[in-house]
Amino acid sequence: AVGCEVTVVPWDTPADKALAMGPDGIFFSNGPGDPESVPPVVDAVRACLGKLPVFGICLGNQVISMAAGAEIEKLPYGHHGGNEPVMNLLTGKVEITAQNHNYGLVFKTMGELVPELSGGVTEHFDDMREWSRRGIAPVVMTKELGRVRLTHVNLNDGTPEGIQFLDAPTFSVQYHPEAAPGPTDAHYLFTAFARLMDGDVDYLDIDISKDRLAGWVFDSEDASATAKTRA
């Protein structure tokens, strides 16, 4: 819907083969089960991070997090349905999302908080909803991949729902922005990926209501007119 040409490759395609295709960006999709069962995908993510724009959803979010050194846990109660409320910490807006997963990121295992970028907070919260209450999108320092920001939080159980790498062109969410049928609140994330591939530094700075008033329609030819052909 944003004018991208998509080439689908098998889940276990080595990173060098994918990169040899010369894509403008790589999308790590959703998939079934435990991310611990797909180490080749984690290796592929690790080889791609920092080299070109990367976007992941659901299982893609988990393997991107693992590639950055984070731990994944099995949730006490998995998220399954089309009405999970998620707050975008960058805009303060709440999105109704579709989700279908039993595992999730343990954000505190990504690294230590960067206080000057986390509202002065030095200790992690177990419940990510504390960040939504404070209106802060906290940032941690990973061991190898620089700074990572928490961008989205589940308002039902306080689990992390999205991250953004500040020193690499990479972001991911735990839910399904493409859900069909399902809510459309998160369709803007595909526009964000197109903007990232176009070199937009503020690619996630999208206020859906304001952009629509300005004439941007997120799944129309307006988007495709600004997007280059991508693999």
Segments and roles (model prediction):
Residues 92-167, 214-221, 227-231:
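Catalytic beta-strand/loop cores that center a nucleophilic Ser/Cys/Thr
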Residues 25, 30-113, 183-184, 189-192:
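Cysteine-nucleophile active-site neighborhood
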Residues 1-8:
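Short helix-loop-beta junction
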Residues 169-175:
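Short FAD-binding loop at a beta-strand-to-alpha-helix junction that anchors the flavin cofactor
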Residues 86, 163, 173, 193:
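Hydrophobic, well-ordered secondary-structure elements that form the walls
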Residues 175-231:
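Acyltransferase
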Residues 15-22:
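Short amphipathic alpha-helix with an adjacent loop that forms part of the alpha/beta core around
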